[in-house]
């Protein structure tokens, strides 16, 4: 009693230690229950060193402990279960190099306590054989397809069809593993678990079983099982990508990419714990990546796949025959090693992977000849005398096995190896044994020298042809799958390119580079608006000058042609300059730009207040250009008073025909222009008055050459101003177009 209580106390302490170490990993913070369950079971698997054991090692250990012959419902005590686990881990240490030896006793103790906690929570000290097989097959390492094939061999009948009762029992036992790591509310067993996976009206074979459990997504109750194997496969996968949340320079394991946010990628720890930054949300769809490919490699693969005209998508598993292969007849194997127990029906169903054509221990399929039957009978009758005194118990079953020469020769070799002195016992027996060997050798020589029948010669050729055709069909299927995957990859790359070339506002807000570019564009827009305002102010000043010139023309048309220029407008025409106030007020209406301009020009350039600034500026530029063109033509075409009608008709084609009359005489107009020369502007009032008094009819011959030069200068100046206005108009149109595009 004291020893039992001590063992029970040690067991509970080791269980608590295992679960305490699991809690120290902070796995409960994982947001998704599927990943949380898979991570916990992966921790138990690595802690117990079961990830170093594959399904084949488990099957071998079960056979060595004769569990394959037991009924699945048979219960094992703790000592028997500990013996099975000892076989597994001691054999593992033999396979491991000396530098990677494991602590066998600790692994056995941890795994034993975990199995007892999962399958014997009441503490009865017994676990069924079926539960042990399912637990070891689920938690061991290796490929998931091999595990599922072994599990199917345990829950199917002899015809290769799944039994629903056994599958329900399998779910009942295997779902105790998530419950043992405190994930029972998410993946506990329910009555509807089996019905949610398969329909009872449909026969489920091995291929259908593998298709369902290896599909994406798998059944809800077993969704953690494929994820457990994916975790093991990607533990050491390196991704040279920066995490968008924790900003780590690289990732290990899974990599997750958001399907809505541009270039938003998370490492597995940030994704599992629900971290999100910026505009990314946990509700966004994420894609899981188990490997990393550089852009160059992606392009190379896409091109190679597109050129191969086939799809790279491989099937989930190879196709297996619906009917299981018959087990090998082990009765005719030369058993020179220690005999092993014959496999049961359920274990022999797992022989799907055993190639029947490659085994050297297969019985002949052709019926024996009459002479061979008689010879075998003679050998069987001679067997008791042959085995007498050799330490072998003779019975009818042994006699049946001795019906083949291979077994007889094997026994003879063992006898000579174990007891060489038996050759001296009896000369009769030696002669009899030599005759048997000679007869067997002669028959083998005759069979090797004789030619094979045509059917037997063609059998290898037929099998080779069948294998070649099967390989060709598999290759065609693989190429077709690769072609489909290439097309999907090309479509995905095209969509990504289109999305990258047309960034959405949401993506622009998330990218700092795009935000900086947007700020620069807005700053450029403000500068252009200020430039536009300055140009508008300059244009207003030009229009003021034009108004003064038109008033001058009206005054000369109404007054005397010989009047003195001193009575005209004496202030100089201001040149267009960039106003400092215009830069300080970047936006104002077109009506404000016409302030201080006469009514004639305002009527010509007035626009509706509903139009935008760009249209107002374009209309004003056109009007000024037409007016300046008309004025230049007016100055060039005046040759006397008789040209007054031609000037009036020229101005009639413009919008200012009622405002700009022609001067009465060329000399009066020249006198007006002469009075506005810079030399007279900069002179004092006295000089201006004297020059005005001196301008008479008698002085015209002396003033006329200078007036003609100044007239030519004025014409050239107006032409230059016209060209400047054309240039400003074109530049204003270009800048307004750029502002409209950037806005």
From Swiss-Prot:
Keywords: Cardiomyopathy, Cell membrane, Coiled coil, Cytoplasm, Membrane, Metal-binding, Phosphoprotein, Synapse, Zinc, Zinc-finger. Residues 556-575 are annotated as: Disordered. Residues 1-288 are annotated as: Interaction with MAGEE1. The modification Phosphoserine is found at residue 662. PANTHER family: DYSTROBREVIN ALPHA (PTHR12268:SF19), E3 UBIQUITIN-PROTEIN LIGASE KCMF1 (PTHR12268). Belongs to the dystrophin family. Dystrobrevin subfamily. May be involved in the formation and stability of synapses as well as being involved in the clustering of nicotinic acetylcholine receptors. This is Dystrobrevin alpha. It comes from Homo sapiens. The gene is DTNA.
